[in-house]
């Protein structure tokens, strides 16, 4: 044996991947034996991203690859987030996790399913002007604030606003958060007492505003910088800045570079929004939609002010089970100081624009990037082909469902028949007397002569006429016949086997016969 050789015979040699290896995956290659790499995407955080599909080309998703040591990676955090939202039933507000794993204990990967539709960044490029209509902004506000509500309720925060992370599902016309790179655990008091692991994770990673861009950054980050911890109120303040920027074209501090100046302008901006608007003499039905949107923004700012005051009061209360403990029926429940329903309803009414509920579904409203197509022969053919394609997909899905249902019922039928056979055998075994079970040989073959003699005796017994009741003469004749049959049976059995002494009634040993035979012996002895 060579002494210079290092290692053990049972030791596994693992290849250590580098960032260059993860960044240079070739297209049309198979990853992990499941996913075909189609295209390289933009890097998100520390993860390298690729567009992939499965072998049957039915599932498409984004592959995230990241190198981490000692489970310190953002992918593990995102996998926990996706699993939690899926278990809670909120997958429609976020992307769905398809696959995840670890390669050689240092390369973390996950595949997130994508839905057909453009990103918000691409849709904003399609706007004809710098400003967005209040209907489109309200449409976006309903979906985004709903996603933020779910995030804060489940103990997560969004550390940045990036239009590339939000996508439109063209099938449901719903905006959802497609990328969870900037999502991290919350350091809120309600969530810190859940478990020690959650607490250590929240204190060991960065929880402040992620980017150095201060346009949408909350005031607490502008004031505290790196010691800032992103909270629920910070996310709502971020959405307030985003909505105002979309509808008014430019925020007052967008061109400013001084941190102190930006802080002053944001404080003044929030104070002006929280003030009461000037009274108008217009009738309520004649007020412009833009005015309604400004009122919704003011209500938004007022809700945040009230929520901050209530949170300062609740911070002084004890914590039990990971939630503040208010008085009343919700004493043990996790609560939020933000009135999400009131904020979302204001923007929802703007999208509906006073139309009846049965006139048009609010998600089918025309947005700024929607275009009307002329009814030409080419467009009609395109729509017909699309409808046929959708119909064929529905038929194939229904056929697969029926096929699975048929297989399921076949398995259930076989299982039921097996269980019935087991139960029937158990019933027969339970009802069979122990003496018969002991007397009946299992593997012993019967003599054909004995079977023939038994058949003759049985035939004679079946040929008897039915006797009358309470007739002693008939009973005596039957007993004599039984005795003769018994003698015949004993003689046939003695001839087939070794000679044995036939037990006699006077010997005292009981006969293995019926009661009628014993009575016949007693009559003959007399």
UniProtKB/Swiss-Prot annotation:
Gene Ontology MF terms in the entry: protein serine/threonine kinase activity
Example of a GO biological process term: signal transduction
Broad class of where this protein is predominantly found: nucleus
Bilayer-spanning residue ranges: none
GO cellular component: autosome; cytoplasm; nucleus
Cellular compartments annotated: Nucleus; Chromosome
Alphabetically ordered keywords of this record: Chromosome, Nucleus, Transcription, Transcription regulation
Basic residues bias spans: 458-467
Biased composition (Low complexity): 489-498
Region Disordered: start-end pairs: 436-526
Function description: Nuclear factor required for the production of piwi-interacting RNA (piRNA) precursors. Specifically required for piRNAs produced from loci associated with the Ruby motif. Promotes binding of the transcription factor snpc-4 at piRNA genomic clusters. Required for normal fertility.
Entry protein name: piRNA biogenesis factor prde-1
Gene: prde-1
